[in-house]
From Swiss-Prot:
GO terms for molecular function: DNA binding; DNA polymerase processivity factor activity. Homotrimer. The subunits circularize to form a toroid; DNA passes through its center. Replication factor C (RFC) is required to load the toroid on the DNA. One of its GO terms (biological process) is regulation of DNA replication. Belongs to the PCNA family. It comes from Haloarcula marismortui (strain ATCC 43049 / DSM 3752 / JCM 8966 / VKM B-1809). Sliding clamp subunit that acts as a moving platform for DNA processing. Responsible for tethering the catalytic subunit of DNA polymerase and other proteins to DNA during high-speed replication. This is DNA polymerase sliding clamp. The gene is pcn. Keywords: DNA replication, DNA-binding. Pfam families: PCNA_N. InterPro entries: DNA_clamp_sf, Pr_cel_nuc_antig, Pr_cel_nuc_antig_CS, Pr_cel_nuc_antig_N. NCBIfam families: PRK01115.1-5. It comes from the Archaea. SUPFAM superfamilies: DNA clamp.
Length: 247
């Protein structure tokens, strides 16, 4: 059993955070909220999302697991204005999700969860540097790097206590530095890793510009990014594997 009412903007933010990496996912219906974990087909980008029951206008479930086509569900959610409420009701016999938006009625066929890619285990990494940065500064960094390259280096200089972004193209380069004063917080440790810009651009689309994003970095290690949405009642962790640089 699953029956819920949620604001369209909260639902859209939830779907956007996952759909930047995958087209379909499993949703765990827990009594205290929803949980989603997914990895892209290349095993490069992972997402771990939690949306508390308190983020909903109403939320009832006795637990369960459903599989959804994210693009179809996003299209339906996109029919609602930001302030409108979306009613979700699971028909367990037909394995369909009934969706109501201000008089519009949709019936979405669900996917067999067993046919969806296995969920990843996000490794517990001991990363040397930790920063807290505004979402708009991530957006600025990604936009600047995208002008010159398809890769982006993220790093922390522990001596100078700053976070930096490097992108090297065939002819042009971009370098951006943010000092301790520019950041919300900084726990310095030497870190430098190179990443695919395409993945970071996609993740950036889902990060609110006014969000406080905690970023964990190491030396040729994955980057982890954590942020909240839905007034703190939703939480997302992204993990992006690095491109290993040859000597």
């Amino acid at each position: 059993m699953f029956n819920a009412i949620v604001s369209a903007d909260t639902l859209q933010a939830t779907l956007d955070s996952v759909s930047v990496l995958v087209d379909e996912c499993k949703i765990h219906l827990e009594e205290d909220g929803l949980e989603i974990r997914a990895v892209d087909p290349a095993n490069v980008g992972m997402v771990d999302l939690r949306l508390d029951a308190a983020a909903f206008e109403s939320y009832e479930t006795d637990g369960g697991l459903i599989g959804v086509n994210l693009s179809r569900l996003e299209d339906i959610a996109g029919m609602a204005d930001a302030g409108q409420l979306v009613h979700l009701d699971l028909d367990e016999e037909t394995r369909k999700l009934h969706i109501s938006i201000d008089g519009l009625e949709y019936t979405l066929a669900l996917i067999d969860p067993d046919s969806i890619r296995q969920e990843p285990d996000l490794p517990d990494l001991d990363l040397s540097a930790n920063i807290v940065i505004e979402g708009k500064d991530i957006d600025r960094s990604v936009t600047a790097a995208d002008m010159v390259s398809d890769h982006i280096a993220l790093g922390v200089d522990a001596t100078d206590e700053l976070f930096y972004v490097d992108a090297e193209g065939d002819t042009d380069d971009v370098h951006l530095e943010l000092t301790r004063d520019d950041l919300i917080d900084l726990t310095p440790g030497d870190a430098h890793s190179l990443f695919s810009l395409d993945y970071l651009k996609n993740m950036n689309k889902a990060i609110p510009k006014d969000a406080e994003v905690e970023m964990e970095l190491g030396e040729e290690f994955p980057v982890k990014m954590h942020f909240s949405f839905a007034e703190g009642q939703g939480r997302v962790t992204y993990m992006l594997a690095p491109r290993i640089q040859s000597e």
